[in-house]
């Protein structure tokens, strides 16, 4: 009986020890104690109960303490519960301290929660980053297209990381400045001879306003001559003018054809009237003879005139026919 009780007691002790080491990270507490970081066992147990991974808070706290940064465990735990990256924030604080960059924990935590990489921002403040823009096509006043590529050296502005625009805004503004500068040049050769004029003009516009960066320099890495857009536009305009002129000429031709048909119709109408009038002549002669307005001699004289006229008309037609036949031969 005593043996069974002893076994039960030993088993209970083993279960208790297992649960204790499962709940309480003793190894982490020993590491913190060795690093002169005062953390109680109950604090670690409380983290477990609050579903906080103790190592995600204690290890950054050890690094901060060793680096001489005074930050409380409550702030680190609160930042972890807010969804922040505690380790990255502490690394950023250490890097800022080594580089003599003023950066408080609250500021670093706010930057991290805003979705920015605060450690990368601190590193970029020490070691500026070079942003390479895509090829920007611009057209000078003489119609020649120039294709330029720029390299922008920027340094992170920690004070404007929250709410400041990112790299894409810098790239867009630099591209706009290049297009404006090249477009204002009278001759594309001026730009090719002096490409640093683009850098000076673009840099003087304060393109970093409202962004999370400070532009240190803008350098034109490459510039090439593209298409002759002016000549192409003139060619297209000439082709368009040609088509318009052809359309107008076709319209005038159609109007002329329609007018010709109208005149032919009018000629036929006049001929019909002549025929109609000629049909009335015998009636008029008969009426004149009945009424005694003309005599028989006058009538025969009129017939002779008509016959003479017809004969002359026939002779003229025959002479025209002979002339045309001789021309064909």
Swiss-Prot record:
The chain crosses the membrane at residues 4-24, 26-46. It is found in: Cell membrane; Membrane raft. The keyword Cell division does not apply. One of its GO terms (cellular component) is membrane raft. InterPro entries: FloA. The keyword Transmembrane applies. Keywords: Cell membrane, Membrane, Transmembrane, Transmembrane helix. Its main location: membrane. Homooligomerizes. Found in functional membrane microdomains (FMM) that may be equivalent to eukaryotic membrane rafts. FMMs are highly dynamic and increase in number as cells age. Flotillins are thought to be important factors in membrane fluidity. Belongs to the flotillin-like FloA family. This is Flotillin-like protein FloA. It comes from Acetivibrio thermocellus (strain ATCC 27405 / DSM 1237 / JCM 9322 / NBRC 103400 / NCIMB 10682 / NRRL B-4536 / VPI 7372).
């Amino acid at each position: 009986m005593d043996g069974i009780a002893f076994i039960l007691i030993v088993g209970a002790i083993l279960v208790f020890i297992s649960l204790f080491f499962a709940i309480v990270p003793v190894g982490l507490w020993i590491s913190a104690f060795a690093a002169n970081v005062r953390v109680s066992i109950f604090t670690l147990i409380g983290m477990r109960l609050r579903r906080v991974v103790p190592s995600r808070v204690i290890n950054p706290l050890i690094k901060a303490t060793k680096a001489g940064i005074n930050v409380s465990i409550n702030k680190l735990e609160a930042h972890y519960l807010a969804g922040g990256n505690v380790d990255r924030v502490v690394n950023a604080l250490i890097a800022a301290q080594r580089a003599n960059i003023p950066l408080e924990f609250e500021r670093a935590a706010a930057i991290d929660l805003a979705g920015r990489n605060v450690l990368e921002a601190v590193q970029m403040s020490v070691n500026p980053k070079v942003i390479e823009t895509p090829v920007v096509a611009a057209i000078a006043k003489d119609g020649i297209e120039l294709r330029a590529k720029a390299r922008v050296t920027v340094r992170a502005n920690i004070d404007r990381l929250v709410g400041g625009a990112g790299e894409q805004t810098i790239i867009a503004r630099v591209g706009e400045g290049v297009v404006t500068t090249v477009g204002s040049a009278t001759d594309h050769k001026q730009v090719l001879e002096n490409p640093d004029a683009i850098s000076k003009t673009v840099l003087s516009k304060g393109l970093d306003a409202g962004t999370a960066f400070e532009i240190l320099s803008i350098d034109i890495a490459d510039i090439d001559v593209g298409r002759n857009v002016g000549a192409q536009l003139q060619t297209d305009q000439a082709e368009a003018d040609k088509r318009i002129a052809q359309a107008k000429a076709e319209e005038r031709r159609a109007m002329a054809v329609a007018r010709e048909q109208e005149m032919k119709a009018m000629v036929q109408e006049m001929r019909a009237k002549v025929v109609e009038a000629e049909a009335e002549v015998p009636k008029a002669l008969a009426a004149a003879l009945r009424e005694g307005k003309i005599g028989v001699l006058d009538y025969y004289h009129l017939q002779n005139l008509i016959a003479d006229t017809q004969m002359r008309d026939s002779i003229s037609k025959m002479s025209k026919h002979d002339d045309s036949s001789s021309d064909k031969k």
